[in-house]
Amino acid sequence: MSSRIGGHMAATGRNCYRSAMCTVVILRRPGHNWPILIGANRDEMAGRSWERPGRHWPERENVVAGIDLLAGGTWMGLNDEGVVACILNRRDSLGPDPDLRSRGEIVLEALDHADADDAAQALSGLDGRSYRSFNLIVADNRDAFWLSSRGRVDEG
């Protein structure tokens, strides 16, 4: 399920409960010199091995992101076309599940697209049951989308 995030607004991961959660705040200002400002905190499993943002994937030379050394994906990144994507876990879905795919793959799949609209359309058909539950933000200088592995997402 996906929803377009409205114009001049800040959006946050709304499912921040009492357990450790990643947080992202996005300020979209279409037409501004800095159309997207992002603040993020990755606090799920702080001891999990990772490397700082870089071009870690030879098959995705246009992607800059931190890399999760356990599963090989990322929690947040951007591509040379200006698409940014980040994943947020949901309540009761902390950590990996050996029977499911890594949510970090979804961010990389979003960054395979030249704009946020194409990414959101491509990912809207994902089978959420293949992953632990998540919220995904995909944005560029024109659009921003919130995709969820569960149910309907209200527009921001």
Feature map (PLM): residue ranges:
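N-terminal amphipathic/basic-hydrophobic helices that include classical n-h-c signal peptides
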Residues: M1-A20
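N-terminal nucleophile
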Residues: C16-G156
